[in-house]
Amino acid sequence: MKRLILIVQSILLVAVFASGQEMLNIATGKTEALKLSKASTIPTREVEIVDNSIIVAYNFTNVMISEDNLNPGSKFLKITGFCNENTPTHPSVLTRRDLFALPNANDIKIRLLESDFVEYDIPIAPARPLLTDSEDLFDTYADAKPIDSGIGIYPESIVNNEGYESRRNVDVLSVSVFPIQYDVKNKKTRIYTKIKYEIVADVDLRQYYESLDSTDDPVLENVVTKAISWGTAIDHIDSLYLTKPNIQDYLIVTVPKYMRAVKRFASWKQLMGFNTHILSRDSWNNSPDTVKHAIQNAYEQYPDIKYLLIVGDVEDVPAKQYESLQNNRHGYFVTDRFYASLNSDNSCEFYYGRVSVSSAQEAATVLNKIINYEKSPVTDASFYNNGIHCAYFQDDNSGNDRRDNYEDRWFIQTSEIIRDAITSKFGKEVARIYYAEPAVNPEFYSTESVRDDYNLPTELHRPNFSWDGDGDDIISKINNGVLYAFHRDHGEIAGWSQPEFKGQNIDSLNNGNKLPVVLSINCLSGKFNVDTCFAEKFLRHNNGGCVGIFAATCVSYSRCNDVLACGMFDAIWPSDKLIIKFHNITPETIASLKPTYRLGQILAQGMYRMSEYNFSNEFLTYQKRIFHCHGDPSMQIYSRVPTSFRRQESMVTKSDNLIQVNTRSLSTITFIDNKYHTFKSYTGTEAEYSTAYPDYVTVCVAAPNKIPYIVAGKHAILDGYIDFGPIIDDNPNNGMIADGIVKINSSSNSSTVEIKYNLNSLACSASIIITNVFGNKELTINNLPTGNNASVTTQNLPSGIHIATLVKDGAIIGSLRFAVSK
């Protein structure tokens, strides 16, 4: 039997800084008082892969017990790495999420193999809901509802399938583990000493993990790596620098009045390596279902779509409406995630964004800002070395007469965690624009956090720091030039509550092409279904403003927001310092293993980080729906001063019938043939393009933190619309479809494998080669039919992971992995 032990992990110590708590040894029942010192409730976890199954074993020794100050006699239990239930009317039992990357999570089975528990007479406290960023502290907690007496034993099962999120061909399964069960009627608490469970798949998982290669998608690679190994490096078979086709399609959904600006933008993205498609209708009939159906049809026609951009306000392209979690207070909210979730609410087929504009001029302003940011970045080094953090010290949990100098929320603490990581490891200069009420004396961070020292830095104590940050300070810094602007506090449709920065302040910005990316992590500032919200105002602003902004369309939840913010910064600047720690939601996670700079991926990385913190499905789904990328999801932020390619003039060479590119560093290399209106793009260090007319070919070489290098061919249109890259309308066959493998259908119920592909050249020699993951050839299919969505079938492949590669005239066009199980 093949075994692969991935890790035996002890979860980090938690510092306990609260009185009235005690440690319980689960097996013996002995307790001891806790003082202001570090204390351990560390479970162990062993994860191993055995053929087609994953086996997870937990062992628990101690649990911490504390009083519920709102319900005398009730208790909270705490185990490091597990969080308290936060669903109202439920008992506050402990749970965590285990995440696993799988080829097909829909077909897996989960079985409990072993478990042991000890029962105690401990009354569990009612669950407390998460706080929003628009409410004070105690009113919300006091609203925590009593436990529903009809629940019985909760949870019924201590290991549960919580569903999965799909991104491309990888499913990330979430499994909830409960070391505590509560008998509500009899007030009996089962505390488990051992939980062992198994996930059974229909393919060899070891072989599957060895075959994974997601180097074109850093977010997916980070998630897969964590889900497989929790930080253990994965050895990919393919070299990172091996040249391969860059297959990334980009779909833009809009209406005709924005077409001029959209076409120019689509042409630019084509140069940057995206096969762009425009989906336009005179009217979307105010129907999100109509929009989604059209996107679904486009995705079936172009299955390599990875980015979705909506251009237009909700009056142009509607957004999906849902009830908020507190509908009686906050009504409905809108989301565009609906359009990226084609298969289910848990799937997300593309990275998505919206440029919400209401006129052709606004569309031109915003899209041109994005093009210029990528194409001609500013040369001022100070712009890339500076950021601003805007936050509020909230200390009003007990009324003005009982302020205690401790921060009630995490606004300042989250800002300082991020600032410390960015300044100490990456050398950025981050200005603090902080505000506190004049009567407040900021001295300590919230004791809900886990840290060795709760004192604010000395430089933040009064009178060393004035705590009077305002809109004028923000305007001054942005006008001087900052790479990013971060806000953590309460928010509203008009803007930031404290330090106050609203639409009228944006009118005073004149930062020109020094355009920051804005992280507006608060409530409501991205509510684009009303008349010009803060995010729309910031993005649309001419002669400055921002180039992209993340913001929420409804009220958002405080701890989720703190985690989201740290996860987003960790996507750009990976650092262990960006692992935020709460007492009752302590993560078992690691920093991102690989940075990503694309806005849509940055948001997705933050969303995945929230999943690692064990928030309930209800809160996770809600947070994922409300936070949006206002801007281009494919745009890459310049995380440092951009530089030109070394010896770029010699990178591109042309002969009579061949163009060769050698970059010496990992790049996206794109060829646009202006004579035949064809498009090819590759990732790697070198690429070539065969043509009888090399002077008509435009070449673009791009890479993160590099200024794009463009060699224009004859008839190139570098500042307008390249008239190819289809506009999709009622004729689904409009436009050019790139050659490549489209989809592979295989089933555990059949030995037949269907391979769908696009092959548009009649006079060519083409074949499909099937290999195993180690590169050993298994089958060659010759004499391929040509056309869009052509197909061939084969049978009798052995069980396991295979790779199908389309070869045309001796050149690799594209490849796709697939699994066969019998």
Please tell me what each predicted stretch does.
Residues 21-721:
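Cysteine-dependent hydrolase recognition
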Residues 716-733:
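Short, compositionally biased serine/threonine- and acidic-rich segments at solvent-exposed termini, linkers
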Residues 7, 19-20, 267, 713, ...:
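Intrinsically disordered, low-complexity regions enriched for glutamine and histidine
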Residues 9, 674-676, 736-822:
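C-terminal outer-membrane/trafficking sorting elements
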Residues 1-22:
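Bacterial Sec-dependent N-terminal signal peptides
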